[in-house]
UniProtKB/Swiss-Prot annotation:
Function: The VP3 protein is one of the five proteins (with VP1, VP4, VP6 and VP7) which form the inner capsid of the virus.
Location(s), subcellular: Virion
Primary gene name: Segment-3
Name the UniProt record assigns to this protein: Core protein VP3
Record carries keyword Protein transport: no
Amino acid sequence: MAAQNEQRSERIKTTPYLEGDVLSSDSGPLLSVFALQEIMQKVRQVQADYMTATREVDFTVPDVQKILDDIKTLAAEQVYKIVKVPNILFRHIVMQSRDRVLRVDTYYEEMSQVGDVITEDEPEKFYSTIIKKVRFIRGKGSFILHDIPTRDHRGMEVAEPEVLGVEFKNVLPVLTAEHRAMIQNALDGSIIENGNVATRDVDVFIGACSEPIYRIYNRLQGYIEAVQLQELRNSIGWLERLGLRKRITYSQEVLTDFRRQDTIWVLALQLPVNPQVVWDVPRSSIANLIMNIATCLPTGEYIAPNPRISSITLTQRITTTGPFAILTGSTPTAQQLNDVRKIYLALMFPGQIILDLKIDPGERMDPAVRMVAGVVGHLLFTAGGRFTNLTQNMARQLDIALNDYLLYMYNTRVQVNYGPTGEPLDFQIGRNQYDCNVFRADFATGTGYNGWATIDVEYRDPAPYVHAQRYIRYCGIDSRELINPTTYGIGMTYHCYNEMLRMLVAAGKDSEAAYFRSMLPFHMVRFARINQIINEDLHSVFSLPDDMFNALLPDLIAGAHQNADPVVLDVSWISLWFAFNRSFEPTHRNEMLEIAPLIESVYASELSVMKVDMRHLSLMQRRFPDVLIQARPSHFWKAVLNDSPEAVKAVMNLSHSHNFINIRDMMRWVMLPSLQPSLKLVLEEEAWAAANDFEDLMLTDQVYMHRDMLPEPRLDDVERFRQEGFYYTNMLEAPPEIDRVVQYTYEIERLQANMGQFRAALRRIMDDDDWVRFGGVLRTVRVKFFDARPPDDILQGLPFSYDTNEKGGLSYATIKYATETTIFYQIYNAEFSNTPDSLVLINPTYTMTKVFINKRIVERVRVGQILAVLNRRFVAYKGKMRIMDITQSLKMGTKLAAPTV
């Protein structure tokens, strides 16, 4: 028995000043999931009709907690690598010659393998390939050199060969002693110089690097050398302001020794977040609302008032017939408690979430429930002035219910003088003839509800987030006041509550007036807590901007639809009574409150990167119209989304809005100028700048069709042949003479194909030893090396595909220009046992495709030129230096408990 009593006492929690039972406990992420479920029910009603005529969409409710964890993981990722040696960017292919080798720029070799093959009729694949190639540039160049291997040579510090970025060890065994000594002398000259960057000692040396990679490296190094000191000061100063607003002390533990001379620090993200970046996303109002709930809303309990309040006012008689007395002992169901959650969500997000009444025939037939809801609804909600918690329909229904309650004479009969209009509450009641018209809803002035004659929105000291400067003051309560629940609310009142008491007394409802008079302290504590939650915890970049907030009520009244329409949730009549008898009491602050700014910064940074990607991709159709004939803006939108982090996509698509974003939404967002500065954005913009030359992406439109005989040299002098390092490639040193080039557009080839003369026309051009260029379409280029004769599909491959078929007595032809093009290098080898005609065939072999790229991808060099590519300045940080990413310091902090919790 004692154990049962102990378990019962554990289940029933009470506050020091209230003896009501604790009903449930809700945290921010849990409430966000609940809110998302309820919002999705409303959103689906609108979307369902549209989706019945289109494709099916997965409407499962996402896991908000998992999304937040993924974003935190995203914040921990580094966009740069710390390495000891850079990547090998130049390699050498050994030929039979002792003084000549082939030098290969490995950047172009690797870039040729990135992405899919481009075709004319798959624009989304083209966009995706471009993004992959740009990300490849950014990834290869985002490195920081630290603790590079060095050696001592005659008192000088010299870089080890692997640091230089040139691979030549495979060449050394075939060189003469003289050549090896020459290379060794050049290596001994790779002296490490001592430099000073941002008051830090560094090593400076000359290495080899491809131009696109070096641009990214140089931009990253410039970002570090710029120190970002002012940005850090701004971020920390802003965090202190935010901590003052949210009662959070931000720890500077991570920042205590970062200014030491042995520390190099990097700040990859910045604060404050630009709110325009977050709110410019198309159809994002619901997603931002859910993120605001999940990251900021505290964990709380729904607590009932002291039961003695109702026992000494409403149920003091043995026989009770009044509506309030009837409902006093009622117990809420699970669905009704869910409605209570909706009501408090609507109170915490005024204007963004508004309430309407469920169509429930059972409750509409119960007059007691409706009457009680009509009274408490006027004391719970705000309807007009600056914002509203209700729809116009619900406000009118509450007016009708209050009208019925005042005219319900169950104790004594009072005098009523009816007005001429027949509107709800158009009468005067009681001995003093109280005019009840003042309690009829007026959204323009807020009369009849909590906003009546009250300043419930004010602007005072500047808020940390510039877009949300408003302070909500339900019942005129200032959120800066400290709440002592044992005494707070005593002697406090506001206009609507006073008028309600006056009207109840005038109507002869003395017991109910006494009940509300006793409930006033509990009621004021309720709204004081809500004010604190709204103005402190819920203040974030996901808060609705002031201009949108101020437009919500006028747009609702006018029936205008804007970017941030309110979400309407349905509640039952009786849930208003249960909500009035429960107060949301915060017990624990949100676990993510101190890291919310970092989450916001990561999200805004990723959005900015996506916007930059889409801006550049939107220009592609104008730059390369031949390869994007069927392209639409939705194609590059999908391509960017597919290559974006899953967590960011999940946040953007919390309400499944991506299925309904149109081209207008998309292009408007792309063209808006707002961006969130970050290291990732800086490197992404530099990568796009490097990719403006599409040949650096191994894409080219300079592909020609020309019949050329594969060389078959005679081996009269094998030794001389081997020393020359003979090779053949279909890569042109320069474009062909323009007067010998025939430009084949799509119109020309269609005309000739329709006449059945396409192949004959090309054959005539080839016989005249001329060149054909097929349109200006971009093609994917691959680089391959062969020690023997390449396969026939490479040698005789054509720079187009031409297929014909016959169907129904008609001939059809399909022509595609965008095909994969291969640049091949055939290295000739000869043995001393070969005869002079060993490489000669009876019938010649022809190659049909020639490519011109204005880049030195492969070149034959002499041994003395192996290290000629060492022309880039590199900065390396010494091994005893620490490279410290202080981005995580932007989330270190300790939540302060509310003074009275």
